[in-house]
C-alpha cells in the first residue's frame, strides 16, 4: 500500500490535525505491513497559488512553454504524481475562519487538472483519481460537525468526488479550545471515528 499524508496546518509539529492524521497513518501501517508513506507538509513547503502566470503555463502547449512556464507546471506535476501513486490519502485539516487553510486550497488547485485527474465527457465530468481511500482528519476549536457552519465537509466531499475519490471518511477532533477536558474528549472521539473509518 502507498499512503500519502498531507498536513495542511501552519502549526507544524504542534498541530492537532496532524496529530490525528498521524494516528490514522499509524493504524494503516499496522494493518498493512510494508506500506510506503509519503508525507507532504504544505505549510513548511508551500505551493504557489494558481495565478495568471500559472494558468498561462497550464494552457500553453508543452512544446511552446517558456522555461519558467515549464518549471511552474513541473511543480504541480510532482503533487499529481504523488496522489496518482497513492492507494490511501490522509489529510490533516484545521478549521481556519470556517474554511480550509489556503495551503490546502493551493494543493487542491494543483492536483485538479483537466485530462489528467478529471475529464469532460458527453455525460459530464469524470474523475480519474479512482480506487483510492481518503481519510480527512479535522481539528477544530469549537463544535461545528453537522451544522451549517461546517463548510469544510461539503467542499471536500464535492472536490474529491469530482476527481473520482468517493470513498472518503471524515474524522473529527472538535472542541479543542473549550478547555482541557473538552480537548481530551475531542481526541477520544477522533479515535472512535478512526476505528469506524478503518473497520
Swiss-Prot record:
InterPro entries in the cross-refs: Flavodoxin_fold, Flavoprotein-like_sf, FMN-dep_NADH:Q_OxRdtase_AzoR1, NADH:quinone_OxRdtase_FMN_depd
Known cofactor(s): FMN
GO molecular-function terms, A-Z: electron transfer activity; FMN binding; oxidoreductase activity, acting on NAD(P)H as acceptor; oxidoreductase activity, acting on NAD(P)H, quinone or similar compound as acceptor
Co-factor binding details: Binds 1 FMN per subunit.
E.C. number: 1.6.5.-, 1.7.1.17
Keyword Oxidoreductase applies: yes
Catalytic activity as recorded in UniProt: 2 a quinone + NADH + H(+) = 2 a 1,4-benzosemiquinone + NAD(+); N,N-dimethyl-1,4-phenylenediamine + anthranilate + 2 NAD(+) = 2-(4-dimethylaminophenyl)diazenylbenzoate + 2 NADH + 2 H(+)
Keywords: Flavoprotein, FMN, NAD, Oxidoreductase
Record-listed FMN binding positions: 9, 15-17, 95-98
HAMAP family in alphabetical order: Azoreductase_type1
Similarity-based family: Belongs to the azoreductase type 1 family.
Role of this protein: Quinone reductase that provides resistance to thiol-specific stress caused by electrophilic quinones. Also exhibits azoreductase activity. Catalyzes the reductive cleavage of the azo bond in aromatic azo compounds to the corresponding amines.
Subunit composition and interactions: Homodimer.
Name of the protein: FMN-dependent NADH:quinone oxidoreductase
Native species: Aromatoleum aromaticum (strain DSM 19018 / LMG 30748 / EbN1) (Azoarcus sp. (strain EbN1))
Higher taxonomy: Bacteria, Pseudomonadati, Pseudomonadota, Betaproteobacteria, Rhodocyclales
Gene encoding the protein: azoR
Amino acid at each position: 500500500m502507498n499512503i500519502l499524508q498531507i498536513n495542511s496546518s501552519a502549526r507544524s509539529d504542534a498541530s492537532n490535525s496532524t496529530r490525528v492524521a498521524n494516528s490514522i497513518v499509524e493504524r494503516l501501517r499496522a494493518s498493512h505491513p510494508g506500506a510506503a508513506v509519503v508525507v507532504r507538509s504544505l505549510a513548511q513547503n508551500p505551493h504557489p497559488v494558481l495565478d495568471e502566470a500559472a494558468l498561462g503555463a497550464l494552457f500553453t502547449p508543452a512544446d511552446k512553454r517558456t522555461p519558467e512556464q515549464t518549471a511552474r507546471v513541473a511543480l504541480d506535476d510532482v503533487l499529481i504524481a504523488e496522489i496518482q501513486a497513492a492507494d490511501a490519502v490522509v489529510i490533516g485539516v484545521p478549521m481556519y475562519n470556517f474554511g480550509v487553510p489556503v495551503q490546502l486550497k493551493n494543493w487542491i488547485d494543483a492536483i485538479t487538472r483537466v485530462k489528467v485527474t478529471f475529464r469532460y465527457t458527453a455525460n459530464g465530468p469524470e474523475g480519474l483519481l479512482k480506487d483510492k481511500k481518503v481519510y480527512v482528519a479535522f481539528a477544530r476549536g469549537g463544535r461545528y460537525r453537522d451544522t451549517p457552519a461546517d463548510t469544510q465537509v461539503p467542499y471536500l466531499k464535492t472536490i474529491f468526488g469530482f476527481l473520482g475519490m468517493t470513498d472518503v471518511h471524515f474524522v473529527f477532533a472538535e472542541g479543542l479550545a473549550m478547555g482541557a477536558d473538552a480537548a481530551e474528549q475531542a481526541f477520544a472521539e477522533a479515535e472512535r471515528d478512526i476505528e469506524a473509518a478503518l473497520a
